[in-house]
Amino acid sequence: MAKLGEVCDILNGYAFKSNQYTTSGVRIIRISNVQKGYIEDKSPVYYPCDDENVKKYELKQNDLLISLTGNVGRTALLEEKFLPAALNQRVSCVRLKEPDKVLKTYLFHLLNSDYFEQQCMKAAEGVAQKNLSPKWLFEYKIPIYSIERQKEISNTLDKIDLLIILRKQQLAKLDELVKARFVEMFGNPSNNSLGFPYEPLSNCLLSIENGKSFVCSNDMRQEENPAILKLSAVTYGVYQQDENKAILDSSMFVKSAEVHKGDLLFTRKNTPELVGMCAYVNDTAPNLMMPDLIFRLNTNEKINKIFLWKLINHEFFRGKIQNIATGSAKSMSNISKERLEKLAIILPPLHLQNDFATLVERVDQQKQTVQQSLEKLELMKKALMQEYFG
């Protein structure tokens, strides 16, 4: 065992002023850029190259960056593509002193482990916002194996990481296949490029059902006890039954609000970007209820639920959904039942909708196989990380 500060230099960042950001120069790596395992920088900010603090807080390729505020303990490896770069405040840079004694890949896997992140959370101070001390990082003890053992550990975890990436890419490609097939069969739904008839959504529905409001625990339910779905069970367009909260009094269970296989659930309230997302329930455990932030869309014989699900969530149609929402750009947006019923949608022949739904079902079966493989890999990685690092 060795202290992290004995094998690494631990450097703090600088409070670069946002009013001096430029559109080019040296990239400033902020705490928001440091995600678990990677750097996220879709909206980069820069500082003038000749600024003295830029030179003082300059980062190097393969530096390990650790978040010190909020979600503390997230660790990312700085790749060459992000250089030149400088370190902002509340991010620590961990830089190996002797790379021939500790491998950067080994140290990255160690610091990117769930165990290390949990230890950071425990050590962090603050109520409203957690803060981690660089001094604690210096004192944190890490296992140091022989170089041969470090290589073995790194190679094993690298191989699993690669397989995990490949499985995620497979899932993304299957999703893209469905989106592409939708456009091929039905055109661009935002401008009805294939000229299908329009109908108000109300003409395709038997009813829109509301969920219920309950006093809940913050914890997920145990076994199959009654629970209410969280908004996140539907938010991203795929039904997630584990996103639920136990209700405090099981006698308050409302049968009419229970979710069933074949339901089409719609988020009536969310952020402006995510409001109006839809999820089809391929299967579900019993005793899960809809919250009052979710509608259930009960369709009639004019429309296939799976077609409607993919239409509502399609990137080319999202603008129309967001246009019927009310609320300011900075607040939660809301879609009323009345506005939803008036939404104009394309209505292709039912046989085309059914053909498309059959494709979606086949693709979902393939996704399920890939997802199961992904989950096994993630469990394997978690077990190995526990074995190697605690």
Residue locations for each model-derived region?
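Short coil/turn segments at secondary-structure boundaries
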Residues: K17-S24, K122-A123, L194-P197, V215-R221, ...
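A short beta-sheet element
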Residues: R30-I31, V54-N112, K230, V254-N313, ...
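Contiguous mid-protein beta-loop-alpha structural module that forms a pocket-lining wall or clamp
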Residues: L163-K168
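Non-catalytic DNA-recognition/assembly elements of restriction-modification systems
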Residues: M1-G13, E139-N155, Q169-K212, K342, ...
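Sequence-specific dsDNA recognition surfaces
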Residues: G5-S18, S32-L64, S202-N218, S232-L264
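Periplasmic-binding protein-like
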Residues: F116-Q119, F317-K320
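A short glycine-rich beta-alpha junction/loop motif
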Residues: A85-S92, V102-T105, E125-E148, N287-F295, ...
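A generic structural signal for short beta-strands and their flanking turns/coil linkers
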Residues: G25, S43, N88-R90, N225, ...
